[in-house]
A protein has these predicted regions:
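Extended ligand-binding regions for polar small-molecule ligands
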Residues: 2-11, 70-72, 79-80, 84-85, ...
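Short, hydrophobic alpha-helical packing/hinge segments within bilobed ligand-binding/sensory domains
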Residues: 4-5, 26-29, 123-127, 133, ...
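Ligand-binding cleft/hinge of the Venus flytrap
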Residues: 5-14, 94-117, 148
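Acidic, polar ligand-binding/catalytic clefts
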Residues: 6, 10, 15-79
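Alpha-to-beta junction loops
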Residues: 13-15, 31-40, 84-85, 129-138, ...
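Short helix-initiation/N-cap motifs at beta->coil->alpha
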Residues: 17-28, 73, 112-126, 163
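A ligand-binding cleft/hinge motif common to bilobed small-molecule-binding domains
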Residues: 42-49, 97-104, 127-161
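Periplasmic-binding protein-like
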Residues: 59-66, 148-184
Length: 192
């Protein structure tokens, strides 16, 4: 996302000021005006459309990953996660999907998965490697990269839905139009 921010700032002739933020903080940062734009792997959802404007820049696939020595060979539906400890981010599409699958598991008489909420990637890696969590449910690109980089994890399934990831701005401020035009231009010239 910082690379996209740099490309956008350059395209729009703006000076970039990157402000590191936790996932949980971006909505308030945008609505309060602390940030003009948020780029933290934010997927466009109907609920978020009510509060924010979006300029999309990629399709997001989700993935399930496990420790490379795990007995879990595949995750393709709710039953595969019954009774498992699953790392998800609070307020994410992954959490929404997992909670929906938990409802399906309970309706079918199966144990729900136990959501494990962590705020940083290092803790997630530690939880998976130590056995404190069974599955990490997050962006497919990150899961594939981690698996290839260290060999300590493996991807065992893809999430049921794809979403669009977007730059996010305060609703109605008009900035989204300039951002989308810049993104479209970056796509046309091959920069993005």
């Amino acid at each position: 996302d910082p690379d996209i921010a740099r490309l956008l700032a350059g395209s729009l002739g703006l000076k970039l000021k990157l402000v590191p933020t936790a996932w949980e903080d971006w909505p308030l940062g945008i609505t309060s005006g602390r940030y003009d734009v948020a780029l933290v792997n934010i997927a466009v959802t109907e609920q978020r459309k009510a509060k924010f404007d979006f300029a999309t820049y990629r399709v997001d696939s989700l993935a399930f990953s496990v420790k490379s020595t795990s007995d879990i060979a595949s995750v393709s539906g709710p039953a595969d996660l019954a009774g498992k400890k699953v790392i998800v981010g609070s307020g994410t599409n992954q959490e929404r999907i997992l909670l929906g699958w938990n409802a399906e598991n309970e309706a079918a008489g199966r144990q729900p998965a136990l959501p494990v909420y962590l705020t940083d990637d290092a803790s997630g890696n530690l939880y998976i490697q130590s056995g404190r969590a069974d599955v990490f449910f997050g962006p497919q690109s990150v899961a594939a990269y981690k698996a290839a980089l260290s060999g300590k994890t493996k991807v065992v399934g893809l999430g049921p839905k794809k979403a669009y990831v977007a730059t996010t701005t305060r609703k109605g401020n008009g900035l989204v139009y300039a951002l989308q035009a810049a993104l479209d231009g970056l796509d046309l010239d091959g920069s993005h």
